[in-house]
Structure formats: structure tokens, C-alpha cells
């Protein structure tokens, strides 16, 4: 696994964070050291797939990056005639994802598309995964995307939505942000790396509160919604049609 050193040296003109070649190369290391509970979420996505995925249906991994969630789901699918569709708008991610998927043998076909997830038609879905993806979608487009997902899910189909959260209570928000930064420092990131990455993400990652996510999901049509995992200001929700 290649080590993430992207923000280790001072960057004079710090642009917006992008999922480019450099990020794609070190992404597994970056996300493990940056997102508390990431491995638990990936493992649980497979467990959810065991429960949600039905025969003759599709599974969508929207914002699939290098395929960790796709592979976790595929390992746990036992139903016949299931196909997984992974989508990411970063070509370097898609190329590595295809290599990663092809390195493992399985009877379950996987198609990885390089596209904007907002362009994808969701249909005959028994499960949809949004694993730390919605926070990078423009806020004005999030409701419509969730509505498309709800419409494309079969009855009893499930959506797993993992996100970084913000909290309305400023004192609590500041505390959880500080604890997250402490988590990153404990994983070997310097103060410079933490601050430069935070600045680079400011304009591209817009976080919402848990309440906002629940309201959006309700408005999309979901009635069964639960936060099933949280560690500091990161967590994952499940919604069932």
C-alpha cells in the first residue's frame, strides 16, 4: 500500500482537492488513516448486502473509488443473477478499481463506469451504496439524487449512506472535529498535512447534519431510516424502501 504524503510538504498555491492520479495512487492508505471506522463500515456493507440483495437484481456502488465497498458486497452475495454497477467520475480511480476487481475471481459480474453519478439511471436495485460520496455532490442536487435512488430501488431494497457529519451545536462540532484531527495525528499525519488537506477540501466537500440527512431521506420516500454507525463526526446510515 502506497503511503499518502500528498500534503506533507508546504504547498504554495493550494488548489481544491481532486481525486486525481496522485490521490488514486495512495487512496487506500489515505482513507484508512483519515476516516475513523472505515474498515468497520466496509465490512458491514458486505453484511448488509447479505440481507438486502435479491436474485435477478442490480447493486449500485455510487462513488466506488477503488472498489472496497463493491468487493465487500460481492463477497457476501449468494443470490443468483446479480450484477454490481460501480460508478466514479475519476478516471484514475476507475482504472485502479477495474484492476482491483479483476484481481479477484467471482461469478458475480461487476461493471465499473466512469461517469457522474447524477447521470446514472437507477433501476431494479436491491441495494445502493453511497460510501462517503454524497458530501461531494453539490448540495442542491442531493435531494434529487436520493429520490432517483428511492424510485430505482425494489421494495425492501436498502441504501447504505456513509458521510462525514457536521453538528448544529458548535461546541460539540468543534470537539468532534478536534478529535478527528487527533485521530489523524495518531495515524502519522503532521499538523501541516491536517491543515493543508482541510483547506483543500473546504470548497469541494460540504457536510450536512444527521438531521438534514434524515429529512432528505424521508422526503425521498424512505420511512425506515437509522444511523447504524458513528465514530466522532463520521458515520453511516441505512434506509429501507
Curated annotation (Swiss-Prot):
Its EC number is 2.1.3.-. GO terms for molecular function: carboxyl- or carbamoyltransferase activity; S-adenosyl-L-methionine binding. It catalyses: prephenate + S-adenosyl-L-methionine = carboxy-S-adenosyl-L-methionine + 3-phenylpyruvate + H2O. Keywords: S-adenosyl-L-methionine, Transferase. S-adenosyl-L-methionine binds at residues 38, 63-65, 88-89, 116-117, 131, 198. It comes from the Bacteria. InterPro entries: CmoA, Methyltransf_25, SAM-dependent_MTases_sf. GO terms for biological process: tRNA wobble uridine modification. CDD domains: AdoMet_MTases. It is an enzyme of class 2 (transferase). Homodimer. Belongs to the class I-like SAM-binding methyltransferase superfamily. Cx-SAM synthase family. NCBIfam families: carboxy-S-adenosyl-L-methionine synthase CmoA, PRK15451.1. Catalyzes the conversion of S-adenosyl-L-methionine (SAM) to carboxy-S-adenosyl-L-methionine (Cx-SAM). This is Carboxy-S-adenosyl-L-methionine synthase. It comes from Histophilus somni (strain 2336). The lineage of its organism: Bacteria, Pseudomonadati, Pseudomonadota, Gammaproteobacteria, Pasteurellales.
Amino acid at each position: 500500500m502506497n503511503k499518502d504524503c500528498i500534503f506533507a510538504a508546504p504547498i504554495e498555491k493550494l488548489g481544491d482537492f481532486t481525486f486525481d492520479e496522485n490521490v488514486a495512487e495512495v487512496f487506500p492508505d489515505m482513507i484508512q488513516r483519515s476516516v475513523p471506522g472505515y474498515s468497520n463500515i466496509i465490512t458491514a456493507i458486505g453484511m448488509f448486502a447479505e440481507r438486502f440483495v435479491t436474485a435477478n437484481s442490480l447493486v449500485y456502488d455510487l462513488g466506488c473509488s477503488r472498489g472496497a465497498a463493491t468487493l465487500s458486497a460481492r463477497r457476501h452475495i449468494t443470490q443468483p443473477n446479480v450484477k454490481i454497477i460501480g460508478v466514479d467520475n475519476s478516471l484514475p480511480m476507475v482504472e485502479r478499481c477495474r484492476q482491483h476487481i479483476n484481481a479477484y475471481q467471482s461469478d458475480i459480474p461487476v461493471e465499473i463506469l466512469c461517469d457522474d453519478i447524477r447521470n446514472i439511471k437507477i433501476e431494479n436495485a436491491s441495494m445502493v451504496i453511497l460510501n462517503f460520496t454524497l458530501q461531494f455532490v453539490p448540495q442542491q442536487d442531493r435531494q434529487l439524487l436520493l429520490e432517483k435512488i428511492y424510485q430505482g430501488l425494489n421494495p425492501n431494497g436498502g441504501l447504505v449512506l456513509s458521510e462525514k457529519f457536521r453538528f448544529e451545536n458548535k461546541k460539540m462540532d468543534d470537539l468532534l472535529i478536534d478529535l478527528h484531527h487527533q485521530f489523524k495525528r495518531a495515524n502519522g499525519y503532521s499538523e501541516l498535512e491536517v491543515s493543508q488537506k482541510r483547506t483543500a477540501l473546504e470548497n469541494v466537500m460540504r457536510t450536512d447534519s444527521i438531521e438534514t440527512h434524515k429529512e432528505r431521506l424521508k422526503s425521498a420516500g424512505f420511512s425506515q431510516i437509522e444511523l447504524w454507525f458513528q465514530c466522532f463526526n463520521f458515520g453511516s446510515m441505512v434506509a429501507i424502501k
